[in-house]
């Protein structure tokens, strides 16, 4: 009932070379387990640390296998993924866990709970073994998530030092600390309820990466910032990807006065079903109506609109109103929904009154649309590197020189409240 392969021993490379990323694959399907393992072994910078059938196997082997990343199935015999997750995090400091699940509502809800308990990310898994074998997008996305989430962990072999200075990605610690605000209670190893507060092991996970992030941030040149628009903002646009659900929950919880003044439109890279659940979580966090955008519905202040999975969401002018326009066209920036279509469309509706926030995420989605918003007289705020899970999207905006502010996640909401009140310029 255990492993399909032996646990691989840690490798020692010549000093100065990077160790391969050690990935543990945990799935009760031998076919899927073998397929993902072959994909990992085909990557020059990765290796399979262990290939296991159940969550119980993973918990018992995690210290010996010493993985950097665990790809963890949700539905397994003996001990499922959500039950194994806190035990894995308690046993292995700095462990990155990517939850893998099929696109069912139940699994989407479990994935969100896993994020609140310390999982780094999730990935939707194709429904059948045949679909997995043919799923180039699934393979690409999984390898990218493993690589980008683990980037800050990589270091020269045999050197017990912080991540190298050339690591451009943000600390996963924000994922853990944002869980404190999620109001989802955790349980200890004995199953007893405890306060919603980070496990001591998770606090330790927070401390070291934060210091490395702070050192890198201090050594980096300060970004070139633009002045905020002289226009009073009339709409808030938000784009996010990896790490976005937790960041969005934190952000919307603090911008009630903004939502009351204007519409809030969000694109989060996420598949169908998951966006439905995310909208429900956002409504609870904000205490305001939030739902997936519906084609041709009128956009109103006091509401949060989320791009539905598998559709681009744009806005358009229709008489005196702004309306949602859903687009089933090709992926943009390899994503659907993508941030750029939303940002670009906002110019025709709000011109210089559009204010956009680019949160944590891989890639550069939002940068082109943000550039057009700035050219039209609007403003961009980017999440800073230290508080981002992955500083791809916000980093691209910063490097493009289009941002009026680059802020830690916890400082973005207060800044937005001041800006929309007219006193934050």
Swiss-Prot record:
Residues 22-140 form the Response regulatory domain. It is found in: Cytoplasm. Residues 150-174, 203-223 are annotated as: Disordered. Phosphorylated by CheA. Phosphorylation of the N-terminal regulatory domain activates the methylesterase activity. GO terms for cellular component: cytoplasm. Pfam families: CheB_methylest (PF01339), Response_reg (PF00072). Its main location: cytoplasm. It catalyses: [protein]-L-glutamate 5-O-methyl ester + H2O = L-glutamyl-[protein] + methanol + H(+); L-glutaminyl-[protein] + H2O = L-glutamyl-[protein] + NH4(+). The keyword Phosphoprotein applies. GO terms for molecular function: phosphorelay response regulator activity; protein-glutamate methylesterase activity; protein-glutamine glutaminase activity. Involved in chemotaxis. Part of a chemotaxis signal transduction system that modulates chemotaxis in response to various stimuli. Catalyzes the demethylation of specific methylglutamate residues introduced into the chemoreceptors (methyl-accepting chemotaxis proteins or MCP) by CheR. Also mediates the irreversible deamidation of specific glutamine residues to glutamic acid. PANTHER family: PROTEIN-GLUTAMATE METHYLESTERASE/PROTEIN-GLUTAMINE GLUTAMINASE, PROTEIN-GLUTAMATE METHYLESTERASE_PROTEIN-GLUTAMINE GLUTAMINASE 1. This is Protein-glutamate methylesterase/protein-glutamine glutaminase.
